[in-house]
From Swiss-Prot:
Protein residues bound to Zn(2+): H566, H570, C668, H672
Identification of the protein by name: Alanine--tRNA ligase
Native organism: Clostridium tetani (strain Massachusetts / E88)
One function term, GO molecular function aspect: zinc ion binding
Keyword set includes Cell division: no
Catalytic activity: tRNA(Ala) + L-alanine + ATP = L-alanyl-tRNA(Ala) + AMP + diphosphate
Subcellular localization, as worded in the UniProt entry: Cytoplasm
Cellular component annotations (GO), alphabetically ordered: cytosol
Main location: cytoplasm
Cofactor note: Binds 1 zinc ion per subunit.
Superkingdom, natural source: Bacteria
GO term, biological process aspect, one: alanyl-tRNA aminoacylation
Names of the cofactor(s): Zn(2+)
Pfam families hit by this protein: DHHA1, tRNA-synt_2c, tRNA_SAD
Length: 879
């Protein structure tokens, strides 16, 4: 057995199964396509589910992949053990109704013993208790010693998840050390002790489990295998930890160098090194697949991993941002297998650095607040942080709840997770309701997936806007029906259609369906997961029946407006590359009849000059009346021709290339104008940020662009009338008016400051003493924040040793300020804690340092009550 690098093992596996007639497919994105049950791809077979279920036809009946995967279920163990990680690669070979046990078992043995040259006396095989077929194949079709085959029960060697396809499995195991194992009991014990490790699982999907728990044989059984690449590498490299594998150790070594720490000398520091090593691998691949940090979904997983790694960097004493530097080692070691890593290297680094900077801005403030919470709990003798406070850390300071847990765990404090969940649910309620409203399919999707896969629709919409078609399926609610009557709403599938179904960022067509004594409104057109084109209809007159021949007509004016926006999006994409930079890539888009929206990767807002030049270049190309050509070709031919493809998109072997002269060439299935002149006019209406490193441009074309300009002109004319000036003088006139207003406001504020200063003597008459600390407090009216702070500052200087707490009410709100001398702070006074509690009485919040704090409130009528509470709060703080 020779030492093999991780990359070498991957290539050996894929080459081996290509030699057995398998199609080598590139890893799918970590972002699941059309699978709401998964947040991230977590297994090699996960993206292939539609092929196993028959919803989609696989490109070949034999497939082999190396799939990148993310699992965060055991994240708390990452770093603490030698084998836990959130990112891993899963090698697999799959059969969709092609070969079965007779082929896969000998192939597996051949690869392990001949390609990898693993000694046979180091190997063991387990099979399902009753799987005599597998036993016979192992003993008759391979040269394994039968005494090395053990039969195990359902919990170990039978794969099933509820109802549906399932079956027995056979696993191959490697013994690191020790004498030959002679019994099942000894095998199980040595497996539990990690002396024996499983590295390849062969799943024989041969049954379909029904609702009565009957196991019915499948007519076409499948094969699904999985070999963890990192685990296999530990075997081939003779190491005991995934963190010692060549490509992963390179990442760990880089972190060690940055931290100036030697791995293996300190247990706690080793944990941090392993956490960062694993997490930086995960985030590098996640960002390369288009995931961006956010506070929900997979973006939250990314943010959590980044911030957890960043915090462990702080524990190692690393100053400043560093994760973005480490990712280059991940890329260097993996880019040959995953080309997108090298292509997106600068983008990945920028996103990581931006998130590190954001976390650095919030972590210190968040930890300060968390420490205050901890102090409060300790003072009260409590050991559980309330859920609402944990949620505030999450919502306000960007602290993942898991990070709060980790920090508190170090202090032996728990979290009220129920309370946190309650707060989270309250925040998500409206968003959840909105998502439910947009769930256009619901349970109908299940019904449609049961239709024969060959029941497909021919799309004729590139050249036709009206066709005669036959209705081949009708869905109403959750049922397949024969007829829809007047007033009914439902879904129909036809044998051919001119209607474009929503995909690729382009909205679906609308229009009408007509027949004898029937009128139907087609409200939308979409695809389901199996590729069926669904027409969402409302019957206005008459009825439609299965097998009826009808006429379908697309709304021409709406389609024309959509085409203009889609073609303009292609021009915009290329213009951004030329004006802003070649690094620009599409991160998302949407076009309908009203406007276009284009998301792209960039790290700052565009300047006015850049926006002007981009808009000018797009309009220049419109005026050149560039012909638009489409051509269907092989995917590799398309890429070689320079056609732009989305980096996280999976394409069929045949693709459609849309070209606007020599200016733009993209893979696109959408509808377009015949020449750029048809777009008419393009106008950018906004440029904003939508996520870290992602910008969004919205624009309009044609008559919508003209309407936008007319509205702007009308607004300009209205301003000129109000300011009583001409168009050319409007800026000077507005500037002088603003300056005049500022001067008046300054005069008013000066008068208020004088008024506030005149109140000093009245306030000082109410001076009190609390446990040796002078206390000055009071409520004022209509004093702005600046004047209130100035007054508090002067009062503090006058009393020389003590605390000042003031409130000002006006315009339906209240402002608080507190200032304390050094002597008062030394005795226990804390402005931040005092002001926080005082503001809460008035329906507000805030905080600050021990010597100075400020806050706001919504209930000015509570001002006197809040200020009256200061004495008690101060008394409780001073010991």
């Amino acid at each position: 057995m020779k030492n093999m690098g991780l990359n070498e093992i991957r290539e050996a596996y894929l080459n081996f199964f290509e030699g057995k007639g398998h199609l080598r497919m590139e890893s799918f994105s970590l972002v699941p396509k059309n699978d709401k049950s998964l947040l991230l791809i977590n297994a090699g077979m996960a993206p292939l589910k539609p092929y196993f279920t028959g919803v989609q036809t696989p490109p070949k009946s034999r497939v082999t992949t190396c799939q990148k995967c993310i699992r965060t279920g055991d994240i708390e163990n990452v770093g603490k053990t030698s084998r836990h990680g959130t990112f891993f690669e899963m090698l697999g070979n799959f059969s969709f109704g092609d070969y079965f046990k007779c082929e896969v078992i000998p192939w597996a043995w051949e690869f392990v013993t001949k390609s990898l040259n693993i000694p046979k006396d180091k190997l063991y095989v387990t099979i399902y208790l009753d799987d005599d077929e597998a036993y016979d194949i192992w003993t008759k079709s391979t040269d394994i010693d039968p005494s090395r085959i053990f039969r195990l029960g359902k919990e170990d060697n039978f794969w099933e998840i509820g109802q549906g396809p399932c079956g027995p499995c056979s696993e191959i195991h490697y013994q690191r050390e020790g004498e030959k194992i002679n019994s099942v009991e000894e095998f199980i014990k040595k497996s539990d002790d990690d002396e024996v490790i499983e590295f390849w699982n062969l799943v024989f999907t041969q049954f379909d489990k029904d609702e009565n728990e009957n196991y019915n044989r499948l007519a076409h059984p499948n094969i699904d295998t999985g070999m963890g690449l990192e685990r296999m590498a530990t075997i081939m490299q003779g190491v005991n930890s995934i963190f010692e594998v060549d490509t992963i150790k390179a990442v760990l070594d880089e972190i060690s160098e940055i931290a100036n720490i030697k791995y293996g000398e300190n247990k706690e520091k080793d944990i941090s090194l392993r956490v960062i090593t694993d997490h930086v691998r995960s985030v590098t691949f996640m960002i390369s697949d288009g995931i961006l940090p956010s506070n929900e979904g997979r973006g939250y997983v990314l943010r959590r991993l980044l911030r957890r790694a960043s915090r462990h960097g702080k524990l190692l004493g690393i100053k400043g941002n560093f994760l973005y530097k480490v990712c280059k080692v991940v890329i260097e070691n993996s880019h040959k297998a995953y080309k997108e890593l090298k292509e997106k290297e600068e983008y990945i680094k920028k996103i990581i650095k931006l998130e590190e900077e954001r976390f650095a801005e919030t972590i210190d403030g968040g930890i300060q607040i968390l420490n205050e919470y901890v102090d409060e709990l300790i003072n009260k003798g409590e050991k559980v942080l309330p859920g609402d406070k944990a949620f505030k850390l999450y919502d306000t300071y960007g602290f993942p709840i898991e990070l709060t847990k980790e920090i508190l765990e170090e202090k032996s404090i728990d979290i009220d997770e129920g309370g946190f969940t309650k707060e989270m649910e309250a925040q998500k309620q409206r968003a959840r309701a909105a998502r439910e409203e947009t769930n256009y399919m619901g349970s109908e999707d299940t019904i449609i997936n049961k239709l024969p896969i060959e029941l497909q629709t021919e799309f004729l919409g590139y050249s036709e806007l009206s066709v005669e078609a036959k209705i081949i399926a009708i869905i109403k609610g959750e049922e397949l029906v024969e007829e829809l009557k007047q007033g009914d709403k439902g879904i129909i599938i036809v044998d051919k259609t001119p209607f474009y179904s929503e995909k690729g960022g382009q909205i679906g067509d609308t229009g009408i369906l007509a027949g004898k004594n029937v009128k139907v409104k087609i409200q939308d057109c979409r695809n389901n997961i199996s590729g069926k084109i669904l027409h969402f209809v409302e019957i206005l007159e008459g009825s439609i029946k299965l097998q009826d021949t009808v006429n379908l007509t697309v709304d021409r004016l709406r389609r024309d407006a959509i085409r203009k926006n889609h073609s303009a999006t292609h021009l915009l994409h290329e213009a951004l590359k030329k004006i802003v930079g070649a690094h620009i890539e599409q991160a998302g888009s949407f076009v309908d009849e009203h406007r276009l929206r284009f998301d792209f990767n960039h790290f700052s807002s565009l300047t006015k000059e850049e926006l002007k030049n981009v808009e000018k270049l797009v309009n220049k190309k419109i005026m050149e009346v560039i012909p638009v050509n489409t051509k269907v070709m092989n995917i590799e031919e398309a890429k070689e021709s320079g056609a732009v493809a989305l980096f996280d998109e999976k394409y069929d072997e045949k693709v459609r290339v849309v070209s606007l002269g020599d200016f733009s060439k993209e893979l696109c299935g959408g509808t377009h104008v015949s020449n750029s002149g048809e777009i008419g006019l393009f106008k950018i209406i906004s440029e904003t940020g939508v996520a870290a490193g992602v910008r969004r441009i919205e624009g309009v074309t044609g008559f919508n662009a003209l309407k936008y300009i007319e509205e702007k002109e009308a607004l300009l004319e209205g301003l000129c009338e109000v300011l009583k000036c001409s168009n050319k003088d409007i800026i000077n006139k507005a500037t002088s008016q603003i300056e005049e207003i500022k001067n008046k406001e300054k005069e008013i504020n000066n008068l208020k400051s004088k008024l506030a200063s005149g109140s000093q003597e009245d306030i000082l008459k109410n001076i009190k003493e609390v446990k040796g600390i002078k206390l000055v407090s009071g409520v004022l009216k209509d004093i702005d924040g600046g004047a209130l702070r100035d007054l508090a500052d002067k009062l503090r200087d006058k009393i020389q040793e003590g605390l000042v707490v003031l409130a000002s009410v006006g315009e339906g709100k209240i402002q608080f300020v507190a200032m304390a001398t050094k002597e008062a702070v030394a005795k226990g006074a804390h402005c931040g804690k005092i002001i926080k509690e005082v503001a809460s009485i008035a329906g507000g919040g805030g905080g600050g340092r021990p010597d100075m704090a400020q806050a706001g409130g919504k209930n000015p009528e509570k001002a006197e009550e809040a200020i009256a509470k200061v004495e008690d709060i101060l008394s409780s703080l001073v010991k």
